[in-house]
């Protein structure tokens, strides 16, 4: 079903998010879904979340994405296991999304793993992050956003845009520094499951 859907949408989309255990539910691995999309001529945005893997496994998955020539990685913290279909699962969170961005940027730019070991043929990716544009201003929402930019985010995806003035405030006050921001609109989003 996943491959069939990829074929059907190939000419209609610029890129497709491939989630990584979205909502703390068991799904196809994001690198595998990304490979299917690449084979069908669809550009993937491979999501990598920190909930289920330690830094060794995360770096291994990122290296695998590079070997498969996945062009875009989006680093996420991950939903808590209690939100999913197996609430007794133990979360890992060895890194957070900012730390994972730093790691991927170092692997790409410095050709180094966290251990300092060299990555001979450093992968090339566009690195992204997610941001909630509706966090109350009193919560200091842009500190974490600024940290993601400093860590290497080159694009940001937001949650669905229902409040256009609130989204405009985020764009104006968020300190985007030339970053590409993709505000998700319901009419532009095609959802299909990689189960």
PLM regions and their residue ranges:
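Active-site mouth loops of central-metabolism enzymes
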Residues: 1, 22, 44-56, 125-140
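Conserved N-terminal beta1-alpha1 strand-loop-helix module at the mouth
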Residues: 1-18
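Structural preference for beta-strand elements that scaffold enzyme active sites
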Residues: 15-17, 43-47, 72-74, 124-128, ...
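Conserved, mostly hydrophobic/aromatic
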Residues: 16, 65, 148, 152
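Catalytic beta/alpha-barrel core
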Residues: 16-26, 48-50, 74-76, 154-163
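Active-site-adjacent beta->alpha loops and helix N-cap segments on the catalytic face
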Residues: 24-36, 54-60, 80-116, 138-140, ...
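Glycine-rich anion/phosphate-binding loops
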Residues: 50-68
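N-terminal low-complexity segments that are often proline-rich with Ser/Thr-Pro
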Residues: 176-195
């Amino acid at each position: 079903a996943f491959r069939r859907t990829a074929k059907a949408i190939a000419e209609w989309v610029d890129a497709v998010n491939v989630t990584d255990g979205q909502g703390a539910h068991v799904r196809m691995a994001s690198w595998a879904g990304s490979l299917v999309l690449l084979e069908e001529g669809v550009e993937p945005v491979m999501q990598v979340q920190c909930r289920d893997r330690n830094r060794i496994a995360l770096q291994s998955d990122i290296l695998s994405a590079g070997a498969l020539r996945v062009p875009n990685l989006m680093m996420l913290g991950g939903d808590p296991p209690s939100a999913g279909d197996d609430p007794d699962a133990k979360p890992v969170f060895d890194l957070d999304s900012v730390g994972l961005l730093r790691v991927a940027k170092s692997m790409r730019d410095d050709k180094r793993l966290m251990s300092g070991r060299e990555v001979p043929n450093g992968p090339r990716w566009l690195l992204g992050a997610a941001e909630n544009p509706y966090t109350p201003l009193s919560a200091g929402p842009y500190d974490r956003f600024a940290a993601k930019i400093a860590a290497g985010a080159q694009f940001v995806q937001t949650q669905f845009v229902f409040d256009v003035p609130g989204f405009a405030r985020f764009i104006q006050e968020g300190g985007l520094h030339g970053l590409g921001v993709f505000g998700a609109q319901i009419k532009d989003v095609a959802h299909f499951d990689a189960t």
